[in-house]
């Protein structure tokens, strides 16, 4: 299968830098799939589950937060605030974060606080999905 260069970066580290056969990541419109020879594009990444298949046939998963993806000439760059492998996720902390976000949503504060709580909830739930999916 044809491959492309994939770079997944966050402010504090290079999460992955290597060849890839396919990539699926969360964008505003849903899950977005990328394979070799994909058309050039730029899209906003939303909190959720990212997966990519390496040339050895293994599929890897990560919980990502908001960011962007740029596809250009078989070179894909994913820039996100955070990217976590399943083994890096503390499920108890993610549950606490989800509970706190749900409580904040119910408190009916300003629109900005409401949207922030929604984003926190989405991130916590995606972290839990990635953690559960790794077992």
Q: PLM features: residue spans?
A:
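Acidic/glycine-rich phosphate/pyrophosphate-binding loops and surrounding catalytic core
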Residues: 84-135
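N-terminal export/targeting signal detector
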Residues: 1-7, 133
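Compact, glycine-rich, soluble single-domain proteins
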Residues: 7-100
């Amino acid at each position: 299968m044809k491959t492309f260069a994939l770079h997944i970066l966050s402010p504090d580290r290079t999460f992955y830098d290597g060849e890839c056969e396919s990539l699926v990541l969360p964008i505003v419109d849903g899950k977005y799939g990328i394979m070799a020879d994909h058309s050039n594009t730029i899209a906003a990444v939303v909190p959720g589950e990212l997966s990519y298949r390496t040339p050895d046939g293994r599929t890897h998963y990560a919980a990502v937060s908001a960011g962007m993806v740029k596809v250009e000439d078989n070179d894909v760059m994913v820039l996100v605030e955070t990217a976590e492998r399943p083994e890096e996720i503390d499920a108890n902390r993610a549950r606490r974060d989800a509970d706190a976000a749900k409580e904040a949503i119910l408190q009916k504060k300003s629109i900005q606080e409401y949207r922030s709580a929604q984003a926190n909830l989405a991130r916590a739930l995606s972290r839990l999905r990635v953690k559960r999916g790794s077992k």
